[in-house]
């Protein structure tokens, strides 16, 4: 089932300011926190040097810069998530898509590289890889997308045939071309899955309930006219 949403509802689902889940996503691991702290320390030192150069004439500006740079490590995740949200909100149209899990498979993805020195003093590059779960979601029109997330224990209950609900985003009113998809909700498992928590989840669950909830197979749903049109996903 594909149901178009109003612009107002779309803006509730992907808010301007980062949600708690989005903040946690960009907070990252302890290495990320340390990196941001180092940036804050260096920036504060630069501000103090500017104070010595400019003197008391720029006291108010220096104080403002010191506060901003000193708390960079804290507000940076909010900024990053909000900018990512803003990019998605530039897309004009959205639709609630109730799909079916057509396939589930695992992959290993390269997420970074580190340079280190081995016991012989040689410089070597160590690849950091992460196991990820991939879900192929589709409907009766033949349209499908693949969403991916880091593999976790809670994913072991995911199976083919289960319902998955998410948003399709597009610049075309008929959603015939899909520019972006959000993270997905699997009602049977009460589980969210995706590489980034795009959605305001309480609002999305309310939309899902208004559209009939979901514990049945999508094969039993009555599809609207838009769902019967062929759609194309921009990769």
Residue ranges of each PLM-predicted region?
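Membrane-interfacial hairpin junctions
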Residues: 47-62
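Transmembrane alpha-helices and immediately adjacent membrane-cytoplasm interface residues
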Residues: 58-89
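Intrinsically disordered, low-complexity, charge-dense segments enriched in Lys/Arg
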Residues: 63-65, 140-142, 147, 159-162
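OB-fold/S1-family single-stranded nucleic acid-binding modules
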Residues: 169-218, 224-231
